[in-house]
């Protein structure tokens, strides 16, 4: 298991937020970060630290994306027409592992990434094992036939912790979903407040 995947248990504590809204999150047990033995006196954060925190939250939410890859999403968001913040969210939500997570084929973004990497997902009938693959409008995402009865898939589909967002549709009996349209920030069911505008400010310094 990669260092990036191992860090998932520390992300919530380090950031001090329950990124995925899960009941078992370590942040529900203590509010201070890993390696700390109590709360430190809070100081007013600088603009830089606020922007950095916004970036770390967004990166962490999508499975702790590498800095190099996350910067590429920012560059592409700037290149596209329209609101850069909305463009960034759209790109992140179109990642195949993010779509698999949203469709409730996996319990966490980390599990979704592994599920895609291990070849359990098809897009428009073709196997795709690249988690960062960008899904387009009307693409059909399906769990491969041999994988539809795996416990991890069934457990995720039956979980009541999350709902499938309106910009996607899913049939859990067939384990098949469709990406319908570009999401707006207000459409995305983040359990915590995300501030992509601060991420844009961080990179445009």
UniProtKB/Swiss-Prot annotation:
How this chain assembles, per its entry, is: Part of the 30S ribosomal subunit. Contacts protein S5. The interaction surface between S4 and S5 is involved in control of translational fidelity.
CDD domains from the xrefs?
Answer: S4
Q: Keywords, A to Z?
A: Ribonucleoprotein, Ribosomal protein, RNA-binding, rRNA-binding
- Any one cellular-component term (Gene Ontology): small ribosomal subunit
| UniProt xrefs under HAMAP family | Ribosomal_uS4_B
> Any idea where the S4 RNA-binding domain is?
94-154
Q: Where is this region: Disordered?
A: 26-47
Q: Name one GO biological process term.
A: ribosomal small subunit biogenesis
Q: Which Gene3D superfamilies match?
A: Ribosomal Protein S4 Delta 41, Chain A, domain 1, RNA-binding S4 domain
Pfam families found in the cross-reference section: Ribosomal_S4, S4
Family stated for the protein in its record: Belongs to the universal ribosomal protein uS4 family.
The answer on whether this UniProt entry bears the keyword Metal-binding reads: no
Molecular functions (GO terms): rRNA binding; structural constituent of ribosome
In which organism is this protein found? Gluconacetobacter diazotrophicus (strain ATCC 49037 / DSM 5601 / CCUG 37298 / CIP 103539 / LMG 7603 / PAl5)
Q: What does this protein do?
A: One of the primary rRNA binding proteins, it binds directly to 16S rRNA where it nucleates assembly of the body of the 30S subunit. With S5 and S12 plays an important role in translational accuracy.
Which protein, by its recorded name, is this? Answer: Small ribosomal subunit protein uS4
């Amino acid at each position: 298991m990669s260092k990036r995947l191992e860090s998932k248990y520390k992300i919530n504590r380090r950031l001090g937020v329950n990124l995925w809204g899960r009941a078992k999150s370590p942040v529900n047990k203590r509010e201070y970060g890993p390696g700390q033995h109590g709360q430190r006196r809070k100081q007013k954060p600088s603009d830089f630290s606020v922007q950095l925190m916004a970036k770390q939250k967004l990166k962490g939410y999508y499975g702790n994306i590498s800095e190099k890859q996350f910067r590429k999403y920012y560059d592409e968001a700037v290149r596209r027409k329209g609101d850069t913040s909305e463009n960034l969210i759209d790109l992140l939500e179109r990642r195949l592992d993010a779509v698999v997570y949203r469709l409730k084929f996996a319990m966490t973004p980390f599990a979704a990434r592994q599920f895609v990497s291990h070849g359990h997902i098809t897009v428009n009938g073709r196997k795709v094992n690249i988690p960062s693959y960008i899904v387009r409008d009307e693409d059909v995402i399906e769990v491969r036939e041999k994988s539809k009865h795996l416990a991890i898939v069934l457990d995720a589909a039956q979980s009541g912790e999350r709902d499938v967002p309106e910009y996607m549709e899913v049939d859990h009996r067939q384990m098949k979903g469709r990406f319908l349209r570009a999401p707006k920030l207000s459409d995305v069911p983040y359990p915590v407040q995300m501030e992509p505008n601060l991420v844009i400010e961080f990179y445009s310094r």
